[in-house]
Amino acid sequence: MRLLVAEDQSMLRDALCQLLLLQEDVEDVLQAGDGQEAIRLLETHPVDIAILDIEMPI
């Protein structure tokens, strides 16, 4: 499973990605620090699940 984590707080984003990568069915976790970066990543790297911060800079 491929995931995207979009979170503007880098420490929280890094920790969440590390935890997700420990799951055996997770093969890759993409990271985005803002909404624009998340959209750019999704245009070229399809994911199964996107985990998005509700209050994040565009």
Q: What is each of the regions a protein language model found here?
A:
Residues 1-2:
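Non-catalytic signal-transmission and effector/linker regions of two-component phosphorelay proteins
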Residues 7:
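Conserved acidic carboxylate
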Residues 10-30:
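Two-component/phosphorelay signaling modules centered on CheY-like receiver
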Residues 22, 43-44:
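Solvent-exposed polar/charged
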Residues 31-40:
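Helix N-cap/capping motif at the beta->alpha junctions
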Residues 45-49:
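Short acidic/histidine-rich motifs immediately flanking catalytic phosphotransfer sites
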Residues 53:
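Active-site residues of response regulator receiver
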Residues 56:
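Receiver (REC) domain active-site loop signature in two-component systems and cognate sites
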